[in-house]
Amino acid sequence: MKNVVIVDCIRTPMGRSKNGVFRHTRAEDLSAHLMKGLLERNPNVDPNQIEDIYWGCVQQTLEQGFNIARNASLLAGLPKSIAATTVNRLCGSSMQALHDASRAIMVGDADICIIGGVEHMGHVPMNHGVDFHSGLSKNVAKASGMMGLTAEMLGKMHGISREQQDAFAFASHQKAHRATIEGHFDSEILPMEGHDENGALTLVKHDEVIRPETTLEGLAALRPAFDPANGTVTAGSSSALSDGASAMLIMSEEKANELGLTIRAKIRSMAVSGCDPAIMGYGPVPATKKALKRAGLSIDDIDLFELNEAFAAQSLPCIKDLGLFDVMEEKINLNGGAIALGHPLGCSGSRIATTLINNMERTGAKLGVATMCIGLGQGIATVFERP
């Protein structure tokens, strides 16, 4: 089988979903901006050679409906010969898009693909139109459809305290703010027009969601958001609602060498896994272990990790059971995570992979893992290797 490589990876700035910079920008525009941007940044790639676009999106309705992948590619003015499909594995949608496209390249069904994902949670809320079948209650706890309560359950099972959660959330904002100030996001963010608080058109260059003013005292004062009587999970220790998109240009190693392109990373292995929906946030643990086994690697072989921070109460048990608690500061989410940057559902998989690859380049890391939990009890993971 062919080796699959990433030659470029970018994202939009992350905008707040409530009255944020992208409140007048549609999801198709966020997506099209990155599709065009990838081709503009890589003039050696003939767009007519691109086989397919795989685009993650969870709420596929309203402006995100009717195959947003195809709508965005047409909006971007890409050749009409490029096919496009929209992928949904809930929170792992754009990482699943990466996996699907990679498999197509591995078996020779494509040479070049664009992958990515988008979610405009300000325009299409995550619970829009959700209608669970009542029969699910025979096999799954009702609370399994309430992500915050699953985080509460997982945190309690693993003895994660409110103080630990607040400290984790505080660190996420501090790391993300420091990364912004020091320019560590500059190589992955493709600036995009949005609107400031006065409604004026502005070029958005940085993430809007990060709250550098966050303090431990402020976090401690927040009330539990999901279990008012006995809970520990607050809005401050949960991933922020945000709007954004991310994208990658991937191809076979042979094609990259033929075109004289710099290979930024190679796919070593991929995995998905299921777990009890009541503790959906635990999914990264079995998925990561499975991906590492397929790559012939151990957890100690990995230099850097990007773990999507759905909730602090969810992230910390995963870090503990992967044996990474003692190296958390050195190896995990060096630039913060979704608690600070937000979690635009369909965007996040390729967003964390993009951030991981940029951090691997910056630090000289050889091996990295991007992994995330998925609503209703799944996990997904990808092992990357730099040349």
Curated annotation (Swiss-Prot):
Which Gene3D superfamilies does the annotation name? 3.40.47.10
Give the UniProt entry's GO cellular component terms. cytoplasm
Instruction: Indicate whether Acyltransferase appears among the record's keywords.
Output: yes
Query: What EC numbers are recorded for this enzyme?
Result: 2.3.1.16
Question: Which keywords does the record carry?
Answer: Acyltransferase, Cytoplasm, Fatty acid metabolism, Lipid degradation, Lipid metabolism, Transferase
**InterPro entries, per the entry:** FadA (IPR012805), Thiolase (IPR002155), Thiolase-like (IPR016039), Thiolase-like_sf_Thiolase (IPR050215), Thiolase_acyl_enz_int_AS (IPR020615), Thiolase_AS (IPR020610), Thiolase_C (IPR020617), Thiolase_CS (IPR020613)
Q: Mind listing the GO molecular function terms for this protein?
A: acetyl-CoA C-acyltransferase activity
Task: Name the reaction it catalyses.
Answer: an acyl-CoA + acetyl-CoA = a 3-oxoacyl-CoA + CoA
State which pathway it belongs to: Lipid metabolism; fatty acid beta-oxidation
Cite a single Pfam family from the UniProt record. Answer: Thiolase_C
- One GO process term, biological-process aspect: fatty acid beta-oxidation
Q: Where are the catalytic residues?
A: 91, 343, 373
- Please tell me whether the keyword Transmembrane is annotated for this protein: no
Look up the domain of life of the source. Bacteria
Q: Where in the cell is it found?
A: Cytoplasm
The record describes its quaternary structure and partners as:
Heterotetramer of two alpha chains (FadB) and two beta chains (FadA).
> Its function?
Catalyzes the final step of fatty acid oxidation in which acetyl-CoA is released and the CoA ester of a fatty acid two carbons shorter is formed.
Family classification: Belongs to the thiolase-like superfamily. Thiolase family.
What's the protein here called? Answer: 3-ketoacyl-CoA thiolase
User: What species was this sequence derived from?
Assistant: Aliivibrio salmonicida (strain LFI1238)
